[in-house]
């Protein structure tokens, strides 16, 4: 019996660009991560990271992103302490060993 052929990748280096990063999860979102404050995810950029989080922690994306898929207004993402709003947004590239912090904004007077 012949096994079915595997699909060919149009870009064989695609998987080489995916990096393992550490994600710091704020307490209000830890119900999606079974109480874990940090998790490791594989992604090439912040947008892919959000998708990876959703795949592993169903329901978390609705808390992270608005209906258009953009990060929620009062939620900040930092890559190695750099705010992604001042980098490339969700297209911000990730490297192996990066630390991504998800930080709810604090308001008040």
From Swiss-Prot:
The record ties this protein, via PANTHER family, to: SULFUR CARRIER PROTEIN CYSO (PTHR38031:SF1), SULFUR CARRIER PROTEIN SLR0821-RELATED (PTHR38031)
Q: Which GO terms describe its biological process?
A: Mo-molybdopterin cofactor biosynthetic process
Q: Spell out the Pfam families in the cross-references.
A: ThiS
Q: Could you list the residue ranges that cross the membrane? A: none
Provide the protein name. Putative sulfur carrier protein slr0821
Q: Which InterPro entries match?
A: Beta-grasp_dom_sf, Mopterin_synth/thiamin_S_b, Sulfur_Carrier/Prot_Modifier, ThiS/MoaD-like
Name a single GO cellular component: molybdopterin adenylyltransferase complex
Membership in a protein family: Belongs to the sulfur carrier protein CysO family.
Task: State the Gene3D superfamilies in the record.
Answer: 3.10.20.30
Q: Look up and give the organism this protein is from.
A: Synechocystis sp. (strain ATCC 27184 / PCC 6803 / Kazusa)
* Domain of life assignment: Bacteria
């Amino acid at each position: 019996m012949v096994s079915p052929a595997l699909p060919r990748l149009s870009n064989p280096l695609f998987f080489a660009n995916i990096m393992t990063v550490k994600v710091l999860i704020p307490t209000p979102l830890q119900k999606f991560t079974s109480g874990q404050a940090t998790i490791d995810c594989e992604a090439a950029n912040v947008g892919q990271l959000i998708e990876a989080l959703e795949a592993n922690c169903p329901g978390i994306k609705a808390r992270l992103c608005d209906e258009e898929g953009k990060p929620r207004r009062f939620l900040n993402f930092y890559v190695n302490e750099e705010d992604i709003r001042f980098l490339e947004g969700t297209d911000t590239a990730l490297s192996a060993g990066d630390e991504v912090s998800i930080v709810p904004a604090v308001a008040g007077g």
